[in-house]
From Swiss-Prot:
<protein>
    <recommendedName>
        <fullName>Uncharacterized protein MJ0368</fullName>
    </recommendedName>
</protein>
Length: 106
């Protein structure tokens, strides 16, 4: 058998508790961390700048679709009406940028 582990040994290793429990960091969504400009979206410290180049436009169009559907998901989960209004405003601004691109080339 050499150095092979038995099933029981593997099970006991798998169930061995970690030395330190990992603390779950609670993240709170705050719409004020999102800034939307004429051709960019900034979410916290991530800034996505959209070009007017049609070649790049296709990827950007799809990226905006992802952002829009993510915001819709957040909107549906949140009960706070003030946050819902903020998210809706952000969604509308991003949708406006998205509509700048002609979806016909997709």
């Amino acid at each position: 058998m050499g150095g092979d582990m038995t099933f029981d040994e593997f099970e006991s290793l798998k169930n061995y508790p970690p030395k330190e429990s990992i603390k779950e960091e609670k993240r709170v969504f705050n719409p004020k961390n999102i800034e939307v400009g004429n051709n960019f979206i900034k979410i916290e410290d991530i800034k996505i700048i959209f070009s007017k180049d049609i070649e790049k436009g296709e990827e950007e169009y799809l990226l905006m679709d992802v952002i829009l559907s993510s915001l819709e998901g957040i909107y549906n989960l949140i009960e706070d009406e003030v946050y819902k209004k903020e998210i809706k405003k952000i969604w509308e601004k991003i949708n406006e940028i998205r509509n700048y691109y002609n979806p016909e080339f997709l």
